Regions:
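Bacterial N-terminal signal peptides
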Residues: 7-16
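Solvent-exposed loop/turn segments at secondary-structure junctions
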Residues: 70-72, 120-122, 154-158
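Short beta-strand edge/turn micro-motifs at domain boundaries
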Residues: 133-158
């Protein structure tokens, strides 16, 4: 009887370990996917600042955003796209974008929250470059079999006071 109990306990432990490892692999695949989507958006913007459709292909129609440029929440992919199109016509452009300290939290396999520090570089029409720093959060939801960006919050990350 003791041997049977020992086998059952060992079996349960092995199953729990296997399930946990499988969940961790799925979470890592999700993390890799949402980070890659974010970097692809940046690459599309760098390649062509007017390619708003390409930049927002993974954005949900009900997308919302907070950022330091506007005092209110921006509601909807359509509104965000119109503002991005106007920004794409500006004389300056993004020439570099990097993600530092990324962290992805996955919930129930269909919600992913990506937080990171953004380090970028813009260039104006005269060739002058300006570094850009931000603290960022993006929320993704799996709709069907596709991850979609549903919310983002972008905040400035000022240099520390000396």
């Amino acid at each position: 009887m003791k041997k049977i109990m020992l086998v059952l306990v060992a079996s349960a432990c092995c199953s729990a370990f296997t399930m946990n490892a499988s969940a961790q692999q799925a979470d890592q695949a999700t993390a890799d996917a949402v980070i890659a989507m974010t970097k692809a958006q940046w690459a599309a913007e760098i390649k062509d600042p007017t390619s708003v459709a390409e930049q927002s292909k993974d954005t949900s129609d009900d997308y919302t955003e907070f950022n330091g440029d506007y005092a209110t929440r921006l509601d909807g992919k359509a509104m965000n796209s119109r503002l991005a199109e106007a920004t794409g016509k500006a004389s300056g452009k993004t020439i570099g974008a990097e993600m530092a300290n990324p962290k992805v939290q996955v919930y129930n396999g269909d919600i992913a929250i990506l937080t990171y520090n953004y380090a970028g570089l813009t260039q104006d029409k005269d060739g002058k470059t300006t570094p850009i720093r931000a603290k960022s959060t993006r929320v993704f939801v799996k709709k069907g079999d596709k991850w979609m960006l549903v919310h983002a919050n972008f905040a400035s990350d000022p240099l520390p006071k000396q």
